């Protein structure tokens, strides 16, 4: 586990910049999955450099259900903003399927950015999606 990145002036780097550095580094980057702000703080206290949050953990934490597009974009971005407020660590967050078409994906990126999320990942399933480890999934055509 590496120490927090600093700019040339000694100031802490933006979380987005820090995540890019961590990903580009030759060392293996371990991102513990967190389900709430406390988990993010515990990961920070344990010395991790970044955290990740997935849709299954979010849906199970908030609703006690599997990840099947039951949480809205605003519910997830609000939840992730709490993680980001609780820790200096960069957060790589699940953006589900982007919550619809290309316009929705662009909106998701903007809301996640406002929430303080350093990076996001998007599934290739059609919307609404099915839980990733359950049968009956359909993926978006490559042309789309």
Question: What function would you assign to each model-found segment?
Answer:
Residues 2-33, 41-46:
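N-terminal amphipathic alpha-helix/helix-capping segment at the start of soluble metabolic enzymes
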Residues 14-17, 65-93, 115, 133-144:
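Alpha-helix-loop-beta-strand connector modules within alpha/beta enzyme cores
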Residues 31-34, 98-104, 138-144:
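Active-site glycine- and acidic-residue-rich loops that bind
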Residues 41-60:
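N-terminal glycine-rich anion-binding loops that anchor highly charged ligand groups
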Residues 54, 58, 115, 122-133:
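Active-site-proximal loop/short-helix segments
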């Amino acid at each position: 586990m590496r120490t927090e990145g600093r700019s040339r002036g000694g100031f802490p780097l933006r979380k987005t910049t820090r995540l890019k550095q961590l990903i580009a580094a030759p060392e293996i980057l371990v991102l513990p999955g967190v389900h709430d702000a406390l988990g993010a703080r515990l990961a920070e206290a344990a010395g991790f450099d970044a955290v990740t949050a997935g849709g299954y953990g979010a849906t199970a934490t908030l609703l006690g259900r599997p990840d099947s597009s039951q949480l809205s974009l605003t519910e997830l971005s609000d939840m992730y903003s709490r993680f980001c407020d609780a820790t200096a660590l960069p957060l790589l967050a699940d953006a589900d399927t982007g919550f619809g078409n290309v316009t929705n994906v662009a909106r998701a990126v903007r809301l996640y950015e406002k929430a303080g999320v350093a990076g996001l990942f998007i599934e290739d399933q059609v919307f609404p999606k099915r839980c990733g480890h359950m049968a009956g999934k359909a993926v978006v055509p490559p042309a789309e």
